[in-house]
Amino acid sequence: MLYDNLAVNEQGHLTVGGLDTVALAEEFGAPLYVLDEDKLRENCRTYVQALRENMPEGSYPLFAGKALCFKGLYPVLNEEGMGADVVSPGEIYTALAGGFPAEKLYFHGNNKTDEDIAYALDSHVGCFIVDNHQELARLDEAAGARGIRQRVLLRVTPGIDPHTLQAINTGRIDCQFGVPIETGQAARFVADALGRKNLIVEGFHSHIGSQIFEAEPFCDAVDILLDFAQAMRQAHGFVAETLNLGGGFGVRYLESDPVVDIPGNIRALAQHLRQGCAEKDYPVPKVLLEPGRSIVANAGLTLYRVGGIKTIESYRSYVTVNGGMTDNPRYALYKAPYTVVPASRMNDAREFTCTVAGRCCESGDLIQENIQLPEMQRDDLLAVLTTGAYNFTMASNYNRLCRPALVMVHNGRARLAVRRQTFADLVACDL
């Protein structure tokens, strides 16, 4: 199996966290998001422990809420020693509603409105990741009006290409996020920030991309950031206390994908950082990482009921399910790969080549193409694996479809964490 929390029981059904997925679909319906809390906690602990053991005191991971965000997630993150990266007032509100400490929230965004800034300040968010000069000015003004000095990190782009998808490559020079180092603009950004009396500049942030499987791109980013930090020390006497290296470690969507050694990569990154600081006689800063996908992706899967089976002679066969791009738009957006398995018939031979399609009125509403399954029948249950990240959070009500429920499994039990939407929910905001 793709991950160790998945298995097949005596009935030939897929299990997750020891629970039968067929039984879960019968109890909670389908489509259904399933999140294995035990795997989630294991992933959190991997990051927390690796950073504590290898990085300076005060280093810890921040969960990237864009990957998955619902109220019941945040108590688990807090219990496991995680901070959280939030990108909107809605994510801030959700985290706080889940009892998450405001001081452990780091507020991102390349276009924070005045209302966003005010809400975050009034919510006592711990740190702002500042993206641009205009935000600096507005944040300084708003903090001053409240009589506070706000902690900030400055987002800079190191010009690193980690060879990932264009849509998730965020560290290159030509990017809407952050201020580029290479052009000299980041140096002016730092000078502007240091002159703001209501802001406390703690260090720098960079995020080079996603689905990165080795430490080397992060080490390259560290080299550039340390050179930049040294230049800022020489120019302004400013020493960065914190380097936030963003997220980006990858996950396995297919059996052919490499296994990512998170502790090994963090250990290699720490060694590289300490060596670079020693060469420059620069105090070793604490390090923050922002894992999202690698915390929740392999803790999640999605269950679907098969509806129609259609073979277009001389072309291909389609298996349609009762969900699609409304609950997982990533194949339509990126041709993102996923492993699809016959959850109710795991022991059957998989000799039927087919494309799994969704129910939306779009020819691009596909989940995966040209995969091997058993000869499918109506009401069979399919599972799409590794959907814990960027499925629930990217879901929509296109075609006025209700969003699925989300169930958390833990210690052999399942509990409803997010209820399924109703038709009444669809018109709740209509006037």
Residue ranges and their predicted role:
Residues A268, R274-C277, Y282-L431:
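Charged (often Lys/Glu-rich) extended helix/loop segments that serve as interaction or gating elements
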Residues A84-D85, L105, F128, F204, ...:
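Hydrophobic residues within beta-strands of alpha/beta enzymes
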Residues Y3, G159-G308, L373, L401, ...:
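Active-site loop/helix belt of alpha/beta enzymes
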Residues A67-C69, G90-E91, N111-T113, N132-Q134, ...:
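Active-site-proximal loop/turn and secondary-structure-junction residues that shape catalytic pockets
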Residues L73-Y74, A97, I117-D122, L139-A142, ...:
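Short acidic, glycine/serine/threonine-rich loops at helix termini
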Residues A64, R151-T157, H205-H207, N244-G246, ...:
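Short beta-strand segments
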Residues M1-R151, A187, A191, G195-I200, ...:
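A charged N-terminal "starter" segment
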